[in-house]
Regions:
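Feature marking well-ordered beta-strand scaffolds used for ligand recognition
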Residues: 1-108
Length: 108
């Protein structure tokens, strides 16, 4: 096993307290969605070039109708009629957030 790349919290990525990850595909393109427990957020990462991951979108608790992401933890993805969704646990909100249209629904 070899590490081919890393992504770290900072200017481009919002990953402080990264704790959960799920992957999904749009066509042939792989993506990951990562929960950031300490930043009450989820980050979508474009993995088309595994040696150079690209931030593709973010959702933060309290912004743009995202109200259940405080202390975001677990995440899973699923597909209904070709639409991709993520369900994220918001530990401190005692709830879940269901996000659709990944990654285009999540912006900077």
């Amino acid at each position: 096993m070899n590490a081919v790349a890393t992504a770290q919290d900072g200017i481009v990525f919002t990953l402080d307290g990264a704790i959960g990850v799920a992957t999904f595909y749009i066509g042939d393109s792989p993506y990951a969605i990562v929960t950031a427990n300490d930043q009450d957020s989820v980050q979508v990462i474009d993995l088309r070039d595994p040696s150079s991951p690209v931030a593709a979108g973010i959702a933060v608790d309290g912004e743009r109708n995202f109200t259940m992401l405080e202390r975001a933890r677990g995440v899973a993805t699923f597909t209904i009629n070709a639409s991709i969704f993520a369900i994220v646990c918001g530990r401190s909100d005692d709830g879940v957030c269901i996000c659709e249209h990944l990654p285009t629904a999540l912006f900077y």
